[in-house]
């Protein structure tokens, strides 16, 4: 009885040690997936099969080497089972089949503007382009208008110079002197008056053919011719009446010239004392067979500007060489030496 009880106590002691070791091994499993699942706490561990296997396994009561920390456990009946992590990740087959999503949705305009805003934007762009074109057209018109005004001013300036020259005492002096000569010849005798009138008319015709101013001569020559013809026709009249008529005509001509000069000076401001002194009368006479005297006005010029002379007979601006050629002098090396300043002639 004593030996049996002793064996029973030893067997019970070994069983308690084995159970304690098995509990320690269960705390630290060799399966890594089981370790992760036990730490996360989300896995589902099935221990029912393990208990059955432990019950079925036979425990050997010997002092052999332990395998994996367990003594006397036969590992042969153990089977590798699917881990709980695999069960969690693999989805279960569902009987209800989900309908596929319909991706054929109508295309929407995302990048471009809506139709109304795009139309307004297009209209705004068109208005801006029209405004730009209008501004450009106005700019071009202003520039062309300025260029036209400058050309008109130069032409009008030259015309005004020509008008002042034609209305000056230079031309009137020649006309009045010719009238005096005609009238003096009329007072001497009838035949002489006839010859004088014809000679004066021929001189006037020659001057007109040489390019004298049409405006001035057309206005004044008919009156002079009419006066001369009337004087030549009246052969039996007395000398005092002729002299009175001549004086009246001279006074009228002088008054007309003075009034025109005063109007020209007031309206246009062309005649100033300094400007008139700076523009003296000049003339040249050609040496060739076609040489003739040509009168002109030396136009005022500054430093570095070209010298210009206004021809009285045509009213055109010429260089000194052209002015000498106009008088029939030909090509000369120094044309200014062939141009003489007329100091005796009265200024404007």
Curated annotation (Swiss-Prot):
InterPro entries tied to this protein: Ninja_fam, Ninja_motif, NLS_NINJA_AFP-like, TDBD
Here the segments flagged for biased composition (Basic and acidic residues) are 247-267
Q: Where is this region: Disordered?
A: 186-272
Question: Chief localization class?
Answer: nucleus
- Specify the inducers: Up-regulated by abscisic acid (ABA), glucose and salt.
What subcellular compartments does it reside in? Nucleus
* Compositional bias segments (type: Gly residues): 187-197
A GO cellular component entry from the record: nucleus
In this chain, composition skew of type Polar residues spans 207-216, 228-244
Which UniProt keywords are present, listed alphabetically? Answer: Nucleus
Alphabetically, which GO biological process terms does the record hold?
Answer: response to abscisic acid; response to water deprivation; signal transduction
Top-rank lineage group of the source organism: Eukaryota
Q: What happens when the gene is disrupted?
A: Exhibits hypersensitivity to salt, glucose and osmotic stress and slight hypersensitivity to abscisic acid (ABA).
State the family it belongs to.
Answer: Belongs to the Ninja family.
Q: What does this protein do?
A: Acts as a negative regulator of abscisic acid (ABA) response during germination through the ubiquitin-mediated proteolysis of ABI5/DPBF1.
Q: How does it assemble?
A: Forms a homodimer and heterodimer with AFP1 and AFP3. Interacts with ABI5/DPBF1, DPBF2, AREB3/DPBF3, EEL/DPBF4, ABF1, ABF3/DPBF5 and ABF4/AREB2.
Question: This chain belongs to which protein, by name?
Answer: Ninja-family protein AFP2
Per the UniProt entry, what species is this protein from, by scientific name?
A: Arabidopsis thaliana (Mouse-ear cress)
